[in-house]
Amino acid sequence: MFQDNPLLAQLKQQLHSQTPRAEGVVKATEKGFGFLEVDAQKSYFIPPPQMKKVMHGDRIIAVIHSEKERESAEPEELVEPFLTRFVGKVQGKNDRLTIVPDHPLLKDAIPCRAARGLNHEFKEGDWAVAEMRRHPLKGDRSFYAELTQYITFGDDHFVPWWVTLARHNLEKEAPDGVATEMLDEGLVREDLTSLDFVTIDSASTEDMDDALFAKALPDDKLQLIVAIADPTAWIAEGSKLDKAAKIRAFTNYLPGFNIPMLPRELSDDLCSLRANEVRPVLACRMTLSADGTIEDNIEFFAATIESKAKLVYDQVSDWLENTGDWKPESEAIAEQVRLLAQICQRRGEWRHNHALVFKDRPDYRFILGEKGEVLDIVAEPRRIANRIVEEAMIAANICAARVLRDKLGFGIYNVHMGFDPANADALAALLKTHGLHVDAEEVLTLDGFCKLRRELDAQPTGFLDSRIRRFQSFAEISTEPGPHFGLGLEAYATWTSPIRKYGDMINHRLLKAVIKGETATRPQDEITVQMAERRRLNRMAERDVGDWLYARFLKDKAGTGTRFAAEIVDISRGGMRVRLVDNGAIAFIPAPFLHAVRDELVCSQENGTVQIKGETVYKVTDVIDVTIAEVRMETRSIIARPVA
């Protein structure tokens, strides 16, 4: 009787349209219930039975029920699932398999089976890539996944590397392919094999892509020739090797090993500027005046060189600082080192006065055993030899940026616009509360940005600098010349690492067109999108492997009284994140560890401070002593506690 009743259908429609709904993201908790977060201010409770229909991170539309002053959300429609492709650990065996996603907030096992054509018999503990196939909000009875790739067995010592690379869908090995002969590019190569070029790298480096030569000129001027490995002499644009390099975009440097952008035969041999081997290069000759200014007579040219020495950072630094046993093998090499140190000094001063110089942070290096175990983690400070190479590379990249801009009007540029204009007023207001007065318009210009950075660098601590970081925009890769505020430069285009960066290979081809006086085609914008995405994935992979290795390294320190100096890097409602000064590990200090009485404690991300009873006790950039309370291997998280 009620079937197909138009009045009833209308009533249903009316009720549906009058029921309040909200769209948001599901946040799971460890207690079974969850929340629908609509925005920063508003969230709704999701009871445990309703949480069975959704997963942490799902974007959904939910019906909002109100009972006795309490609102709760009932998931109704899936907008975007949190999980599509993921990695996890297999449980069970044969025909009754489940997979637990490798994610700190996803604890439930998802029923699964191997995809057709996947020839691996999965067993308990195996790591796999899976794809979600069913979801309760899509009308399915339950969650269900399909195993699409076997990664490795559970006890493999190299799990951190293989699982991380699979998670981010990155290559595990060097690309295939060989380059047998150099291309005929119609370039005249200058013979510089008699000059005393040197390379300065880590002792273990095989892919040397830069060699340096310096000489003194009259009037207190110095000449610097930067010679860069020339992979585009072997790899034709559009060839198979070129396409593979374009997809990879960068060499992926992970703790313990790298996955090169080019075949190892090229990166570590044919193109590598090895000592006493004749190699083709792309070179830049520049003149530096007494105050370190790069004069206008910049010259790019093709050449052949023969590096006369493979020097090592620490040995060169020791020698320049008059320590250690090492010394250059000849007076000619010693003279090169002295001249390069002079160039470094001049360029450093020029950048300090006219651009911006980054504060030196140490690099952290994992020392690994045969089975991937972490033997030690050492902080490697940036010493004089590192700075010699850095200053030479920055100078060479400034030269390329100018030449490409003036001769072609395009290239692959690193662009950083400083502060987001939308944040300028808030930035000025924040600085004012700390006694620094800036003009909201001026700070958006390169000069204004540099002026502010110098004032911040002169502050006694980095606290204020950390407060304004959130107002900064991100660096981008662009085909259009533009300023790099972070470096304090009008334009910056890298070409000094073509073995490990595809963008540098593109700039090589453009510079060669300039040398030959030919026209060139502007690179397509999608290549910059691919490069930015790959850079993001590689950084995430490096961080993920690092987190795993840090957890392994610090596991036996948990619960002991071993003290570590730690810098506070972030404060949130839930506690503080700190970086251990000696090894670079990131640890979390939960709010209850800071003060037992929650009502007396205020952790403010906005102000970067922790207050107890109204007194500021901790702030971002403070260095405090901590002990390791717990290391959770399944989430690779390190929990620390301040030393009372």
Curated annotation (Swiss-Prot):
- Is Nucleotide-binding included in the keywords of this UniProt record? no
Pfam families per the UniProt record, alphabetical:
OB_RNB, RNB, S1
Q: Which reaction does it catalyse?
A: Exonucleolytic cleavage in the 3'- to 5'-direction to yield nucleoside 5'-phosphates
List, alphabetically, the InterPro entries matched: CSD, NA-bd_OB-fold, RNase_B_OB_dom, RNase_II, RNase_II/R, RNase_II/R_CS, RNase_II/RNase_R, RNR_Ribonuclease
The record's function comment reads: Involved in mRNA degradation. Hydrolyzes single-stranded polyribonucleotides processively in the 3' to 5' direction.
NCBIfam families, A to Z: 3_prime_RNase, PRK05054.1, RNase_B
Q: Write down what this protein is called.
A: Exoribonuclease 2
Task: Say which species the protein is native to.
Answer: Shigella flexneri serotype 5b (strain 8401)
Please name the gene that encodes this protein.
rnb
